[in-house]
Amino acid sequence: MSKRILSCVGLMVLMALMTGVLTAAAPMAVTTITLEQGLPATMKVGETYTVMVRVASDQKFTSAQAMPDFQYAGKGVVAVNGGDRVGRNTSALLKVTFKAKSSTAKMPGGVAPVAVVVGVRYGGGTVVVQRFEFNVRVP
């Protein structure tokens, strides 16, 4: 009976050690998220600009996505498209287009706070996120 218990305990310890070794063996991806083109400080009503973000990785990612984010959704500056997404790759150029919809004069500071949030997902559940913020004035 004690041999059986001892062998079960030994097997559990071995499983725990092997899990640690296998986890430590997987190198972390080196991910670079770079803003290539942002929004101007001032836009006129009706103007559109595209934010471009480059993603580069030394390992293949499962997906990369860029999404617009607003403090005042639907006012001042709005997204023309809902974002951009690419599948499995090691690099990507993500684009989000914005349009100046209305004046920001009545908003706090006279600007519309707008952001682009980029996420890169890897196998195993690792996610790398970067946020690029802009304050755009629309006279």
Sequence positions of predicted segments:
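Short beta-strand segments of immunoglobulin-like
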Residues: Q37-M43, G83-D84
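Proline/serine/threonine-rich low-complexity linkers at boundaries of modular beta-sandwich domains
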Residues: T19-I33
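Short beta-strand and strand-turn-strand segments in soluble, beta-rich domains
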Residues: T31, F70-G83
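Aromatic sugar-binding surface patches on proteins
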Residues: R88-K99
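Short acidic, flexible loop segments centered on an aromatic residue
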Residues: D58-G74
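Structural beta-strand segments of beta-rich domains
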Residues: E47-V51
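Short beta-strand elements
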Residues: G125-P139
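Short glycine/proline/serine/threonine-rich loop/turn segments at secondary-structure transition edges
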Residues: S102-P113
